[in-house]
Amino acid sequence: MARSDPSAERFPAISVRQPAADLIVRGALRRDRRTRPTRFRGWMLVHASQGVRREEVARHRAALGLERDAAYEPERGKLVGMAWLEDCVADDKEWAYVWAKPKRFRVAVPCRGRYSIPFYVPASLVRGTPAEKVKAGKLEN
């Protein structure tokens, strides 16, 4: 089973559409449905892709901290936080990634996403974020 390596010069990431990316890093989405499985387990950066599922925004307004008529302009094309990928389980014809220990970044970090799971970003991109503490071994697993 693949695990994140805190001493590596790069950090694993996953690209997720909005609002799911925001929901994962807020701890409001614990199971994220995906079309393919992964053997990876451990800390992973959450990248907000360019896509936004507007119908999902309407369903999750409260979890996103939005007032009734407030506009939602999510971060796109940026690292918005990180979470621990705890498991990947079969869920009907899809897979569910099970997330834990979410950490939302105060400031989103611009980054290009990739389709591979995980994809890797330079550790230098996450300076000043909770991911830097993982790299230094100062954030619990």
Segments predicted by a language model, with ranges:
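Structured alpha/beta reader/binder surfaces that contact nucleic acids or chromatin modification marks
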Residues: 2-141
